[in-house]
Amino acid sequence: MESRRAAKSLAFVAMIPLPRGRDKAQSRERSLGVIGGLEPLASADFLLKLVEASHADSAADSFDIVFEQRAHTRGTEPAGDAARQLVLFDVIASFAERGVDRVVLPCFSSQAFLDQLQANSPLPVADLLAALRAHVRRQFPAARRIGVVTSGHLRARGVFERNFPHGEFQILYPRWDGDYSLELLREACVDLAEQGAELIIPGLSELTPFAQKLGPVSVPVIDPHRVYAQYVVSERLPPPERPFKLGVVGGVGPAATVDFLHKVVRHTPAHRDQDHLKVLVEQNPQIPDRTEHLIGKGADPTLALYATCKKLQAGAADLIAIPCNTAHAFIELIQPHLDIPIINMLTVTASHVRELFPALPSVGLLATTGTLSSGIYRHALQKQGLREIVPPPPLQASMMNAIYGPQGIKAGFTSGQCAEDIQVVIEDLVKQGVEVIILGCTELPLLFPEREITTRGGRRVTLVDPTDILARRCVSQAMARSTR
């Protein structure tokens, strides 16, 4: 029965007519992407039963069917599974590009890795074994001993045991393993009946077309293709569950992006790799300098920032973080054109300062001249009842040199003259009565990773790192989404 030749590549689109009894104006057309298995005859059998199920269900919608069968040979397991997964993923991706709503996979071999497909698929995949389990519970509520004729590979993987849970069902197999002809399939069913099976599932795609041609068998033999077709037609599949994905506008600047990602990892309560956040980074250091534009000397970065955010949105990000203080001067214009939120680092920083220091009247700010001139921090702090205190112009010039100069932070320096210049600025702010200072340029925490420092005069001052607060907030939002 088993074909050793690869099925030829085949793709076509067919329109299933509206089911009887439905008014076309009341029907919502849906699109199904059917992926043929390793056996062309089995694929044809399923398509026929899908059409029959659609016509038999008067409550069903009409369907467009996109069918594709790619050339693929059986490989040695598990290498064969891995190769098959890649083929199926490519087909599903092509279905998504064509506007298909959900994927139909009438192939038992693929059920061994269906969880991986569902976890990575952009489309919901109708579960063949879930359809069979629901059918058994509904049509055979008293059945507990389920006979299954399937491949040795699926037996070894425990595919049916996973889907028919122990305690509710007992899975029985024939007392031999190998290829099945129609006659051997009949003998296998007899053997299962003798073992006490109360019903039988042919669990090989190439056997399914012959399930109803076995002749008299003492226990019911399910037709998986018919059951699956009825399930696909009648059941509404929810969109695939996917983990929260954080989108990061990177490259503004590059070192600050790496520092931010490190903080996201550090603040994630993870016990293994899989507990961490999915993160999509669009590293675009070619975005024009934000400060140069704000002080009237450079190109407008709005479009580049927007285009980068749109790429993150297209990549299915749920939330966007921009680890650049000055870039937030452009968020107000960009956000209305996006379908996903940008978390405002300045707003969450101002809120954090107020929560930590309820009676604090003012806060110092170290930032680029562009950030200061835009007033974005001043407005965020005012909403929290905080007054912004900034360096005087000569020291602000030293501040800019420490960031942008030839020995500045953006040039890769994290010690030496740049650190000394910023230390002088901090000393001046402390003399103005400042007790808390916001490191309002994302490169500054690279120089001052501590939460507190002591001035030369012995005064303690708290340093607030906006990227650390942003990372914590991103993680907390991700955790909140995952527990819904």
Predicted regions, residues:
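Short terminal hydrophobic/aromatic SLiMs and anchors at protein ends
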Residues: 1-2, 16
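Non-catalytic structural scaffold of enzyme domains
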Residues: 10-484
